């Protein structure tokens, strides 16, 4: 009798195989969610580091070009062709990079006091460039902490 009950209620091999596939599907659906959250977090971290490094590099590059090509010929600092080309390149490389050549590129003295463009002297004065770029995470959990604006200032002496 006992063997008869085992034989009658033994699941068929096809049923066992379907049950295993269903179990794998449930396990996959439970494991994919934390994996995707971690993956998106790593992508957000990479985007944040890229934006932060990009703003820093953009400020330095614009400053380097501006100290070599100081004015546009009419005495306006930061409006030379080379500087405007560099600004356009950096704006294309860093998403959302903001720089206003009129207010963000200034001539300063050794105490960081602003000097008028016409009074800017090579050898003793400096060029200061300030740039900023907004960053908003795309991962919902990370975006709960809000967005951030990366800012960078570079200062180099005019040769």
Language-model features: locations:
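Short amphipathic secondary-structure patches
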Residues: 2, 57, 61-130
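Alpha-helical assembly-interface signal, strongest on the long, hydrophobic N-terminal helix that forms
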Residues: 2-88
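Low-complexity, S/T/G/P-rich flexible repeat/linker segments used as non-globular hinges
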Residues: 2-6, 132-159
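A short, hydrophobic/aromatic-rich structural module that often spans a beta strand
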Residues: 11, 112-124, 148-159
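Selective for proline/serine-rich intrinsically disordered segments
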Residues: 11, 32, 93, 132-138
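Intrinsically disordered, low-complexity segments enriched in proline/serine/threonine
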Residues: 13, 97, 139-142
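Extreme N-terminus of proteins, especially the signal/transit-peptide cleavage junction
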Residues: 17-20, 122, 145-147
């Amino acid at each position: 009798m006992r063997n008869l009950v085992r034989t009658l209620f033994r699941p068929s091999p096809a049923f066992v195989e379907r049950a295993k596939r269903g179990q794998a599907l449930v396990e996959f659906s439970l494991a994919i969610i934390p994996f995707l959250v971690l993956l998106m977090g790593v992508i957000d971290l990479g985007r944040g580091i890229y934006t932060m490094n990009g703003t820093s590099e953009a400020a330095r590059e614009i400053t380097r070009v501006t100290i070599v090509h100081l004015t546009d010929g009419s005495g306006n600092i930061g409006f030379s062709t080379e500087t405007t080309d560099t600004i356009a390149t950096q704006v294309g490389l860093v998403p959302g990079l903001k720089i206003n050549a009129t207010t963000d590129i200034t001539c300063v003295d050794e105490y960081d006091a602003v000097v008028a463009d016409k009074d800017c002297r090579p050898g003793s004065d400096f060029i200061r460039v300030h740039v900023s770029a907004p960053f908003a995470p795309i991962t919902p959990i990370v975006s709960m902490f809000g967005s951030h604006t990366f800012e960078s200032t570079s200062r180099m002496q005019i040769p």
